């Protein structure tokens, strides 16, 4: 999904919506499917006047139940977003699944990450060694020198390789002396429920207040391009 969405955005300049998948998200049991669908519908059909603050779901889950035998909703866990490094930023939202982005980074289908962008990244079913390598790729490509803030999504079934370290702790170590704001455990990823994010639109990030605010209407941008 990340590859298709970012390629479409790069070739057309139109905002794209990073969000739930048909089977894995909309096929989920209540209550998570209800919240995911509500946020998807809100983003595509209207959310009132801007600015729009993305809501924090009360609960989340990454419990695995085989679809062929699932007969109950997944176990909810108390939810919170985490301020890793305080600060405020405003810029174009860009990003997606980090492992997928690595596969076409630097090609004609990957949008250039510009000065001032807010980078959104998430991943799933990886271990500490793998994401350290992925974060290091971004650092070596000077991505962290260009972006004004980072939003890190929850990591489904993360394997810490016995280190006890969280993905955001590894990110902080890789980034080193960078002082840009970082908000972690954001709910637009492979866990449930899931927000829908308009890639290519301007947002503001306040890591200390744990808020992400949409400043630009994606539907108006699409309409104006016709």
Give the location of each predicted region:
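ATP/nucleoside-binding phosphotransfer catalytic cores, i.e., glycine-rich phosphate-binding loops
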Residues: 149-226
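Structural motif
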Residues: 14-17, 91-92, 117-119, 148-149, ...
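Solvent-exposed alpha-helices and their adjacent loops that cap or buttress functional pockets
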Residues: 9, 85-86, 93, 111-113, ...
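Short, acidic/small-residue loops that bind anionic groups at enzyme active sites
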Residues: 1-26, 178-182
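Internal helical hairpin/lid segments
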Residues: 106-162
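Conserved beta-alpha junction segments in alpha/beta enzyme cores
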Residues: 78-82, 88-124
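Conserved active-site and cofactor/substrate-binding residues in soluble primary-metabolism enzymes
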Residues: 3, 31-35, 92-100, 126-133, ...
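Conserved anion/nucleotide-ligand pocket segment
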Residues: 15-97
């Amino acid at each position: 999904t990340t590859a298709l969405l970012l390629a479409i955005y790069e070739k057309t300049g139109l905002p794209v919506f990073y969000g739930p998948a048909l089977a894995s998200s909309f096929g989920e049991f209540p209550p998570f499917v209800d919240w995911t669908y509500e946020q998807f519908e809100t983003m595509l059909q209207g959310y009132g006047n801007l600015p729009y603050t993305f809501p924090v779901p009360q609960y989340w889950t990454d419990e695995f139940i085989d679809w062929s035998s699932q007969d109950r909703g997944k176990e909810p866990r108390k939810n919170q977003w985490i301020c890793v490094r305080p600060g405020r930023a405003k810029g174009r939202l860009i990003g997606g699944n980090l492992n997928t982005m690595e596969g076409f980074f630097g090609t004609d289908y990957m949008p250039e990450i510009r000065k001032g962008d807010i980078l959104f990244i998430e991943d799933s079913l990886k271990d500490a060694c793998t994401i350290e390598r992925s974060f290091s790729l971004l650092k070596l490509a000077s991505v962290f020198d260009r972006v004004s803030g980072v939003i890190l999504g929850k990591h489904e079934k993360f394997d810490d390789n016995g280190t006890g370290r969280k993905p955001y702790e590894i990110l902080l170590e890789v980034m080193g002396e960078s002082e840009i704001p970082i908000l972690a455990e954001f709910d637009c990823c492979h866990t449930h429920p899931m927000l829908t994010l308009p890639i290519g639109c301007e947002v503001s990030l306040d890591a200390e207040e744990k808020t992400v605010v949409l400043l630009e209407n994606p539907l108006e941008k699409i309409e104006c391009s016709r």
